[in-house]
Amino acid sequence: FLRRAHVIAARRIALLDAAEAQSGAGHVPLETLVRHFLTPALEMAQQGEGGRAFVRIHSQLRGEAGDLGLALRRQAFGASTERYVSALCAACPHLSAEAVYWRFNFMVGSYLVVSSQAGRLEDYSGGACAASNMQAALDQLVPFAIAGFLAAPPAANAAPIAPTALANAKVPGRTRV
């Protein structure tokens, strides 16, 4: 895991370094940040069975609570995550750092779902989409993530989630116990 993760992290940092050098004193454009962050991981998913196995392991580590998975991910991606979050904060001054972290987390989760190629996309799209097409995934994921970062922050007085609404929902074929 770490060997491939370090390749992704190093490529992300190299892309960010180049983008920062090109932008000079200004901040790196949001689209550039998102594309540069996502591309190395989606490229890895195309590197044969080893790349696909890495993505599955990464998805598993991300989905499991526990110190080992967190420590491995922090060791592999900690420096690149800090750099990208900092750059995203500069590119999204309308968001708090907390909001950027949340949206960054959603972006990471999205690319892991897409790159795991578990067959679900093909299933619910009726074969119209192929999760193995990483270029199509990137072309769809970049504007999706950008829209998330550009969205207004949530209202401070937003209504909380009502757990009873879901618990009381009528589900066909389900009997209350």
For the regions a language model picked out, list residue spans one by one.
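Amphipathic alpha-helical segments used for helix-helix packing
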Residues: 32, 49-75, 119-123
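Amphipathic alpha-helical packing segments from all-alpha helical-bundle domains
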Residues: 28, 32-35, 66-92
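C-terminal peripheral helix-coil segments that are non-catalytic and often amphipathic
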Residues: 78-177
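Short linear capping/connector segments at secondary-structure termini
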Residues: 18-22, 58-60, 123-128
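HTH DNA-binding helix-turn interface
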Residues: 1-7
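Short alpha-helical scaffolding segments that buttress acidic/His motifs in well-ordered protein cores
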Residues: 37, 41, 55-62, 107, ...
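Hydrophobic alpha-helical connector segments
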Residues: 7, 11-51, 104
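Residue-level detector of well-ordered alpha-helical segments, enriched
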Residues: 29, 33, 37, 50-57, ...
